[in-house]
């Protein structure tokens, strides 16, 4: 798989921002079929950094409604990537 097919988007939240500042860990939404090795290679190729560790979480869908219309959010996969000491991803710097 192409790195841009594996990494869907960065996850920007208060918790993910604290992980960046304190732990050097970056959070991404990734393709649900991707495994940890594929995610590691995709991040290393896309951002030219050295990945030390990858943790993944399958985030379940939640029921939602708007008025009488009921639906569900999509199930998605979250990857928390720890980089080698001294490496940073510039995409997250301006946030």
Curated annotation (Swiss-Prot):
The UniProt similarity line reads:
Belongs to the universal ribosomal protein uL23 family.
**Mind telling me which SUPFAM superfamilies this protein's record contains?**
Ribosomal proteins S24e, L23 and L15e (SSF54189)
Oligomer status and interactors:
Part of the 50S ribosomal subunit. Contacts protein L29, and trigger factor when it is bound to the ribosome.
Q: Which one GO biological process term can you cite for this protein?
A: translation
The GO cellular component terms are: ribonucleoprotein complex; ribosome
Q: Matching InterPro entries, A to Z?
A: Nucleotide-bd_a/b_plait_sf (IPR012677), Ribosomal_uL23-like (IPR013025), Ribosomal_uL23/eL15/eS24_sf (IPR012678), Ribosomal_uL23_CS (IPR001014)
Give a short account of what the protein does.
One of the early assembly proteins it binds 23S rRNA. One of the proteins that surrounds the polypeptide exit tunnel on the outside of the ribosome. Forms the main docking site for trigger factor binding to the ribosome.
> What are the record keywords, sorted?
Ribonucleoprotein, Ribosomal protein, RNA-binding, rRNA-binding
PROSITE patterns assigned to the protein according to its UniProt record, in alphabetical order: RIBOSOMAL_L23
Tell whether Transmembrane helix is among the UniProt keywords: no
Spell out the protein name for this chain.
Answer: Large ribosomal subunit protein uL23
Q: Which gene encodes it?
A: rplW
Q: What are the leading ranks of the lineage?
A: Bacteria, Bacillati, Actinomycetota, Rubrobacteria, Rubrobacterales
**Protein source organism:** Rubrobacter xylanophilus (strain DSM 9941 / JCM 11954 / NBRC 16129 / PRD-1)
One Gene Ontology molecular-function label: structural constituent of ribosome
Superkingdom of the organism of origin? Bacteria
What are the transmembrane regions?
none
């Amino acid at each position: 798989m192409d790195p841009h097919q594996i990494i869907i988007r960065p996850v920007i939240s208060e918790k993910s921002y604290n992980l960046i500042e304190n732990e050097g860990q970056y959070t991404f939404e990734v393709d649900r079929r991707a495994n940890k090795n594929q995610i590691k290679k995709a991040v290393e190729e896309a951002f030219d950094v050295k990945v030390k560790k990858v943790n993944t979480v399958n985030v379940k869908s939640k029921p939602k409604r708007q008025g009488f219309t009921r639906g569900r959010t999509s199930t998605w996969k979250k990857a928390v990537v720890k980089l080698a000491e001294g490496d940073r991803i510039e995409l997250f710097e301006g946030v």
